Amino acid sequence: MYSIAWRYDYSVANLAKANGLSDLSVLQEGQILNLDLSKVKKQQSSKRSIGTADSKKAAKTSANTDSKTQANVWLKKVKTRDLKWREPVKGKIVESFNPKKLRKGIVFQSAEGSSVRPVAKGVVVYAGDGLRDYGKLVIIKHSDYLLSAYGHNRKLLVREGQLVDSGQVISKLGSSGRLYFEIRKDGKPVNPLLYLN
């Protein structure tokens, strides 16, 4: 569900509520979601319909019940002001946030194989390559309304449902050495530099 909400700049909570699901629900293959199209931005670059591919990715969660329970307990207790934010990778920012130019995040230039770490503690809600233009992507939920995304990875080292700390390596960068990084608040992209120390 997170990958679908991410693709359409839609709040996971609102998408889940509109469909009578909890925001951590796992979708089943072929399950149909009700999208209020008047509130959903259409993407010109994606002609794929929602359904089979995203549902298969969402249904393939390898996290065990204990780690999911631990993650859910942590999410219920976390306060955003208590999160300690850090940069996700050592490198230079080469593309800045600019929503007018459809730049929803920032790009760090580092080196191939560099370690990527979460900007703050959170729960992995998506780990895969089912979203166009992001390559191998990790999305982490930090609170009820804050998500961060890490794209263009060569190798993912975490699984959906896993609780991760800010110092933990979650992925390795691909051949370009670039990390696409985004933060969303209530489903909408915000300038990541407002959060990073």
Regions found by a protein language model. Name each.
Residues 1-169, 175-180, 185-189, 193-195:
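Extracytoplasmic low-complexity/disordered linkers and repeat tracts associated with LysM-containing
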